[in-house]
Regions:
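Conserved beta-strand/loop scaffold segments within soluble protein domains that form the structured core
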Residues: 25, 37-42, 46-189
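A generic N-terminal leader/anchor concept
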Residues: 1-44, 176
Length: 189
């Protein structure tokens, strides 16, 4: 099942407790972004259809994602740039997702000696769905990526994420999950 025909006309309430940049995804699809706290030429965020260069021949969820992916985002931090503020990914799931499968793909690239704090903030309207995400993360030499996943409210969704990529010499990838309750959450690295 694809979620291309789902409509969205709500205003997402952004966190106002601290300054941050953001990416908005609705049902896995890239909607908008704002990087007002960063140097525009040092950070690139665009919509991504799917991960064309990734190949996982023994993973059926990968084939499902490749066939039905509606998008996601590509984020790149330029060489020697340390992001001044975190980027929050507002991952919003609408109420009309019952028995739907969300397939999305994201790609994150940190060039040499760069730093980024990424917060994935999941918000759900109580529908039962399956989220199938494939993420390619490349962290070049001397770079640092801190990834924090926060589940705002209890969710009836089933979350699967496959993370692949390259971590270069003297680089660091830190991942934290703060959940208020999920039916199922599996992350494969």
């Amino acid at each position: 099942t694809n979620n291309d025909d789902l409509k969205f006309d709500k205003q997402i309430k952004l966190i106002d407790d601290f300054e941050h940049n953001y990416i908005i995804l609705v049902n896995g699809i890239f909607k908008s972004c704002d990087i007002k706290y960063e140097e525009k030429k040092k950070l690139k965020i665009v919509s991504l259809k799917s991960l064309e260069e990734l190949s996982l021949p023994n993973n059926n969820l990968y084939y499902l994602n490749k066939a039905l992916s509606l998008g996601g985002f590509f984020l790149e931090v330029q060489k020697d740039y340390k992001c001044k503020k975190p980027i929050i990914i507002y991952n919003y799931f609408t109420s009309d997702l019952d028995n739907k499968i969300i397939n999305n793909s994201n790609q994150i690239k940190l060039n040499q000696n760069s730093e980024l704090t990424l917060i994935e903030y999941n918000m759900s309207e109580k529908s039962k769905f399956f989220k199938n995400t494939f993420e390619n993360i490349n962290i070049e030499q001397g770079s640092l990526l801190k990834s924090i996943t926060i589940q705002k409210n209890k969710s009836n969704g089933y979350f699967y994420k496959n993370i692949s990529g390259i971590q270069d010499y003297n680089s660091s990838y830190q991942s934290f999950i703060l959940s208020s309750g999920l039916k199922f959450n599996k992350i494969e690295i």
